[in-house]
Amino acid sequence: TVFQKGAPLEGRLYDLEKERIAKHLRSNGYAYFYSNSFAELDADTTESQKKTTLYLEVIPPPGESSHQRYTLGNITIYSQFDATLPDSIYRDTVVNGFLFKLREPVFLVRPQTILNAVHLQTGDIYSQDSYDRSLQHLSSLGVFRFVRIRLDADKDDASVLHVRIELTQNKKYELGFDLDANYIDGYTLTGRGSLMGLAFSPTAQNRNLFKGAELNITSLNAGVEVNFSKLNTNAFWNSVELGLQNELYFPKFVDYLYLWRGMNKLPFGKKKLVSDALYQVLQDKAASRLSARYNYVFNFGWYETSLLNASFGYDVPIDNNTRIVLDHVGIDYLRPVTQPAFDTILMANPFLARSFGKQLFVSLFFREFNLSKQRRPNRYGESGFNNLNIEMAGAEIWAGNALYNAFALSQDTLRISGTDFSQYVRIEWDTRYFKEYTPNLGFAARFNVGLARAFGFSTDVPYVKQFFVGGPNSIRGWAARGLGPGGYRDTLSEGLTNRLLFYQTGDLKLEFNAELRFHVFSRLKGAIFLDAGNVWTLRPDADRCGSQFLLSRRMSENCPVNLPFNDPFYKQIAVGTGAGFRLDFKYFIFRLDLGVPLRYPRPVRNLMDTSPSEADYWHDFSNWRLRDVNFNFGLGYPF
């Protein structure tokens, strides 16, 4: 009970208590018992003015002396239901005691798949929990457009409820596509440069591949990026990307190596390592997923990469607002091929050379965990979103390698064809807040923090797993990967041959974004934004002075073109601002954001001064020119 002896009496507690009791009774046979079955709360204060005795009175149904407790009778399943057709056209088929009504001569969905999602049984006491689980489980199969469960009273026995399950088939095949575009316009020391990217991603879905409600999704990705500033030169084509991915979902929980069953039986203090409630959620709601992907990127004149990926895991919709994605097994093979121009960059940037080579990511028990939670708008117009991602690779290989070395008394590192196994852990948290003041005025904010760390035999986190900032969906005053790490200044990115090729990344990321969004007229909307953040390295990097995340200033050595010191992280926060325009066509949004740097992560004046003033970090607007603006074009909102 929500009432506690000695606690203050509140009226709202009575409503909660009525709902609690009604829910409990509906799950114990009383199918039609609701909170309105109670009379007004009766409080007796005759014994004391400061204490009261509460009485809850149950009102019987009209014309009855008590509420009826029900058992379940016949269960009939219309697996190909059509409300426009009479019952007479359906064929009867009995499977495991359940009566199926079919329009077609064969089952479109295997009956056992349907029965696995039905948690009601003839002869059982009616349970609202079992009713809700069945409704939710059948809906989650994805092969039914509509799911309805009716309860009909028996004509001869008032204590029996017959169950009628109506399943309307969904379309088996579905085609769709996504279009993504981005545009970045900015300056380097060589003058203005502009990159335009366009990507097309068609998708084909089969909702019942093997007649067991399996969902197969095949996606193709094709993208190209061009440099308009080099229109009549060989440098016009910047990059090409091609990708193919296939995901196969099974509508059941496949316990990988019986790990979850074992953890459910393993004691953990006074409880279990995996609770019965969590194990039940996995069995009821988890869809098992097999995924394979190939991705190819060719950056003209610089490098090309090929990525192969395969994984196995689960997709678990906890409720309408919460989803968990868990991968047990993950295998990635990354193979880069560099051109002489990029080899020059690698020679000048050992950090990039160490993290850009061939990579093999292998996880056998745990690869990735992703938790996303949506917060629906409240009465104040506030809503939100949270996402936590944890990724790890190589732990099992490293442990096995270390165990072998201990027994063999050696220091060998396991490799395949000269390719090292990467060991790293990566954590990222993203939280967003939205506030709607009026239908034409709103506020949006995002905070993002990420941390990546190599362990085992790896010294650096793979380049593709490191963090970066800048670009249309990040700190819009800088190009993607053109900011940081820390106060480091990348002179190579300002070289005469650079085609807006930025590659600066870090092990730690802090980022904050805020937008005031408003309606202009018709389909045109506007925004004023503020972005702040940076990326850092966790360890000192002799090749990127000023890049380390520190709490206090430390002097640097051998940094002729950079700062003679490494500032604390809060002095290296870059700040940008700007305004944007959005054309809202409901199904997609064209966005143009004009970003301007406000504060740099290092002094831009008096560079070699060991005690620069705060003003030395800020942009000088006395000589403001159009070249100071970064033009960012994209589809959809940045967050």
Language-model-derived ranges and their functions:
Residues 147, 174-177, 187, 212-215, ...:
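Extended hydrophobic-aromatic, low-complexity segments
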